[in-house]
Amino acid sequence: MAISANTLFHFTSKYDTLISILKSKFFLRLCLERGLWHPGNRKWAVPIVCFCDIPLSNMAEHTQKYGNYAIGIKKTWAIKQGVTPVLYVHDNSSFIGHGLDALNWSLELGEKDSEHLNERLAQVMSMFFMMKPYEGYQERDGKRKKVRFYDEREWRYLPPIGGDHLNFLTEEKFNDKTQRDSLNTYNEQYGVDFNPDVINYIIVEKEDEIVPLIHELYSIKGNFSHNSVELLSSRIISMDRIREDF
């Protein structure tokens, strides 16, 4: 069995969020993460859309952390949109040291050319935002658990880098709801739009959610033609069924 799939899955824990994506697009949302490159692993809020490259047969554990609803898109299409696999590193990886050198170099240049400091900083930071630890601790629902992030086979979409507007926040600013909501709203312009043809799967939690979802498909997104809905209806599957059959 292939380890890698031809589909990238974006998971969510809520049915309403699944419908919202189908109505519009994949929106960037700030995600608070520890900076591998920062002394003390300070947290930063990163605007990303996350996907995973795992087959249906390996989804059970993933859904426990990220939800029982998902949209699976064609990997070939995602690559054309700039969706990229993350780089998994450990404490002894030379990439972290090289990255710190690049960050310090950018800051030194920024002191000489303050007009372009934000842009230089964002370019280097975007490199770090595509890194994740090979393994580490994940905080969820007030609990801290050691996990191997490498097993998630994560892919990410980040917003374009450029201009004077920084797309990320420190943890302190992220905890300020006004600043967090403002940047999430700003980043909506960079969301990943799609059409029905690139969807390989729509996953719901329960079998009895399939028919209501088909009814939703007929009423959302103007470019969902009758034929598209017929096609998408055949691509809906429940997590209950996946757990039983795969």
What is the predicted role of each segment?
Residues 1-246:
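NAD-dependent ADP-ribosyltransferases
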